C-alpha cells in the first residue's frame, strides 16, 4: 500500500512467506527509487551519446529475517528443525554406553568417515545422559541423530533418528556414508514437500467479489 512504500521510493514490492501457523512474514523487499535518490546524491552516468544522465536506481534484498523465516516455517514444539542443506550440523553421533570398550572408537571412526564425505557431523562425547543429549540436539534442530552402542556395533548397524518426523530407522554400518547421505537427501525433500503442502492447503482462489 501507499503507507508501506519506502520513503522516497516510486514503488515498493514485497515478498511475503507463509509460516507454519499460516501467518505471513515479509521476507524480502524491492524498492524502485526512480531518480529521486540519484538527484539528491548527484549520481550520474555517461550515456551512449556522451552526455550525463541522472541514474535510475533500486534498492532490494533479503536479510537475516530469513533465519527467522526458516525457524518459523519448520520449527515445532521441541525446538528448531533445520533443512539439511543449511544445517550447521547435519548429523550428530550419540554414543550409547560410551564407557564400554570400543564404543567411542567406533563413533570416532564413523565421524571420520562422514566428515570425509563432506557431511557436517558432531560427536557428542560429553558426560550427559543419552536422553539429555537427544533432547538437546532435537532442540538445536540437527536433521539426523545416530545412536551407536555395543549391541549396534556387534550387529553391524546404527540407529538413525530424523528430526523432522522423529522416525527411527536402522541402517548398516558398512554403508554408513551412503546411507546417511541418502537419508539427508530424503529429509531435505520431505521438509520441502511438507512446507509446500501446508502453503497450498491455505491458498484460496477468488474468482469474484462475492462472499
Could you tell me what each predicted segment is?
Residues 1-211:
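NTP/phosphate- and nucleic-acid-binding module
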Amino acid at each position: 500500500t501507499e503507507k508501506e512504500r519506502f520513503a522516497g521510493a516510486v514503488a515498493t514490492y514485497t515478498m511475503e512467506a507463509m509460516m507454519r501457523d499460516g501467518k505471513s512474514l515479509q521476507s524480502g523487499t524491492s524498492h524502485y527509487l526512480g531518480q529521486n535518490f540519484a538527484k539528491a546524491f548527484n549520481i550520474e552516468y555517461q550515456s551512449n551519446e556522451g552526455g550525463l544522465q541522472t541514474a535510475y536506481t533500486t534498492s532490494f534484498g533479503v536479510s537475516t529475517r530469513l533465519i527467522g523465516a526458516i525457524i518459523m516455517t519448520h520449527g515445532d514444539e521441541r525446538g528448531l528443525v533445520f533443512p539439511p542443506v543449511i544445517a550447521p550440523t547435519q548429523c550428530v553421533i550419540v554414543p550409547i554406553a560410551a564407557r564400554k570398550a570400543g564404543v567411542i572408537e567406533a563413533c570416532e571412526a564413523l565421524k571420520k568417515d562422514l566428515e570425509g564425505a563432506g557431511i557436517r557431523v558432531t560427536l557428542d562425547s560429553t558426560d550427559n545422559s543419552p536422553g539429555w543429549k537427544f533432547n538437546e540436539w532435537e532442540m538445536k534442530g540437527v536433521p539426523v541423530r545416530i545412536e551407536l552402542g555395543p549391541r549396534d556395533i556387534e550387529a553391524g548397524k546404527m540407529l538413525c533418528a530424523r528430526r523432522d518426523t522423529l522416525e527411527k530407522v536402522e541402517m548398516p554400518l558398512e554403508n554408513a556414508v551412503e546411507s546417511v547421505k541418502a537419508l539427508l537427501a530424503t529429509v531435505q525433500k520431505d521438509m520441502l514437500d511438507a512446507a509446500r503442502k501446508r502453503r497450498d492447503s491455505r491458498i484460496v482462489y477468488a474468482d469474484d467479489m462475492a462472499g
